[in-house]
Each structure stands twice: as C-alpha cells, then as structure tokens.
Amino acid sequence: MSLSIPHGGTLIDRWNPSYPLDTLTKEIELTNAELSDLELIGTGAYSPLTGFLTKEDYDSVVETMRLTNGTVWSIPITLAVTEEKAKEISAGETAKLVYNGEVYGVIDIQEIYQPDKTKEALLVYKTDELKHPGVRKLFEKPNVYVGGPITLVKRTDKGRFAPFYFDPAETRKRFAELGWNTVVGFQTRNPVHRAHEYIQKCALEIVDGLFLNPLVGETKADDIPADIRMESYQVLLENYYPKDRVFLGVFQAAMRYAGPREAIFHAMVRKNFGCTHFIVGRDHAGVGDYYGTYDAQKIFLNFTPEELGITPLFFEHSFYCTKCEGMASTKTCPHDPKYHVVLSGTKVREMLRNGQVPPSTFSRPEVAAVLIKGLQQREAVTSSTR
C-alpha cells in the first residue's frame, strides 16, 4: 500500500502569486472562514474543488453528498455576497477576493445564485435551529452565493503556527521521507486527553504513522483556544509518543459542527494530505445533542470503499477503568460504568479554568499543566483589558 491518491485523482494547485491584478476593478470581501476555504482550495486540500461551488454542484452536495460528477463531497463550500454586491458583479467577470484590505485571490465568476438556506441547514446540519453554531453562521451570511474557479495569489500570515502549516504536497513529501506507506489522520478541536491518546495508539498499532491534524480555524467561543491547545499537543507528543511515528500539522478550516457530514468532509481532506486511514470516534464534529453518538460512523456506509479512497477506523467511547487498571472501551471492558473515569468536555474546561488538575487517569499531568497555565494567563489578560 502507498499514500492515498488525492480525492478525484489529482491534487489541485491554484496558487499563482504572479497573477496580474492590475486590470481587475471588482472585488468581494471575504469572511475569515471564506479566507481559510480559499487557501485550502488553492493548495489542494479541498481537491477536487477548484473554486467555490456553482449552483448545480451546490444543490448536488446539499441533496446527495456528491458533486454533479458523482464524486463524494459532503459540505457545501460557498462564497456569500450581499444582494447589493451581487448587483455590482456579473457572470463572466473576474473579481478580487479581499480580506482586511489585502487581495488573497481572484474568482472567475461563473454563476450568481440564491441558495435555499433552510434546506441547506436541514440537510447539512440536520436542524434549522439558530442555537446550532453552524446554522447560526449560515443564516448570518449574506443571501447570495457566487460560484466559480479561484486563483490563490497571496498566502495568509500563519503567525506562531507557521512551523506547523503544511500544504498537502508538503505532507505527502514528509510522509514519504519518513518511509510511511500507511498514515492515519486524527482531527480534533480539543486538547488530547487519555481517551484520544488511547485510540490514536490503537490505530498506530496497524499503520506506519499518525498525522495529528488539529483544527485551528474558527471554533466556538468556549472551545480551548488554538495556541494553548498547540502547546498541549507538543508536550504530549514529546513525552508519550515515539518521535518517528507522529507528525503534527494544523488544519486551518473553520469548524462547521455538521457532525456526520463533517466527518466525511474531514476524511476526504485528510486523504488529500496523504492519509490512508482516518479515525472517527464518538460524536465526531458534533455539538449539543443534534446527532446520535455514532451517526458520524454510520454515514460512511452510504459510500463504497472505492469511492471514499480512505479507510475509516471507528472507535467507541474510551475511558480509564479502575477495575481493568487501564484504558478501555465498551468493546473491551466488561465492568460497570461506576468503575469508568469519564468527564465531560464542559466539566474539564471548568476544572482547568479553576486551576484544578483533572485526574491522571483522564489527562496527562503535563498536558493539564500547560492547559491550566495557558487558560489562567488568558483570563488574566482578559480581566486586565475589561
């Protein structure tokens, strides 16, 4: 087995820093999430997409989780503009894509159309409730979409995360240099606690390497900030993982909280990065109680292994069992739940913010120390600026 073939067969490259911008007069302002999508399209992370979806592909993705050519794609990647802006631009024109006064790309406008946002919400997020963070963002966006291929002309400033940003072409090269033929991807927006460590190491028993690929794009306000999480990942890998079997790189996309649909999307993107396998745990990309615990695993049954092109690895909820004296899951542990050390993410965040160290059976002490220090420093800065 060798590294996965990019989704759709070819790794898309829409990067052209020499693109002639001088003649372009029209421009479209991007949101932070759209800017991330622009860069991920341009570097091939979203292969086979070459731009923001036109109406036919948009409708197909929303309704069938496929592009019009049949390729699996579960999340609509769209560019929204106001009705006023839509009147200023036309199909056939090329517009600059701007963020905070800087031009990051251009779009060859093929189509300007009005989406059915309620339908998009119900099919992609399984709800149209505005308290769902993904749905709320959807309805906060303007009501007109612009579709067409893009060209990426400028890269975003990666700041302190710069050493951990890798385009798909780079990760593929690194994996090959490490001698890895099989690579398992792990997506997270949370710190890695013992349960995550356990399933990652279970997966590492059957593949050559682990690609730990935390999301550092937009998340919910109560999620642990990315800079603090990154420090916690580094201390965990330094102390508890074999250095030649793990690769840490960030994923700059915004979190959609689309549960099952987002699990498919996350798998396809990791396939483009070179992964042959992808870990899907309980309630992947979920929020609240909108999705069933294992819906994100069941959704993979809608597709054949050939059209996915990446092997999903499904894991049950894991925990430390005081009776087993080790990490386990309901598949391997026969004991009553009273022997299981289980803490909710909300409870853990509360403990960390209060300076309380979660039990070592739940979180590595080095990781907890980094999280407590980071959160308390952030709280102190926030308090001083009020």
From Swiss-Prot:
Pathway: Sulfur metabolism; hydrogen sulfide biosynthesis; sulfite from sulfate: step 1/3. One of its GO terms (molecular function) is sulfate adenylyltransferase (ATP) activity. GO terms for biological process: hydrogen sulfide biosynthetic process; sulfate assimilation. It catalyses: sulfate + ATP + H(+) = adenosine 5'-phosphosulfate + diphosphate. InterPro entries: ATP-Sase_PUA-like_dom, PUA-like_sf, Rossmann-like_a/b/a_fold, SO4_adenylyltransferase_pro, Sulfurylase_cat_dom, Sulphate_adenylyltransferase. It comes from the Bacteria. Belongs to the sulfate adenylyltransferase family. This is Sulfate adenylyltransferase.
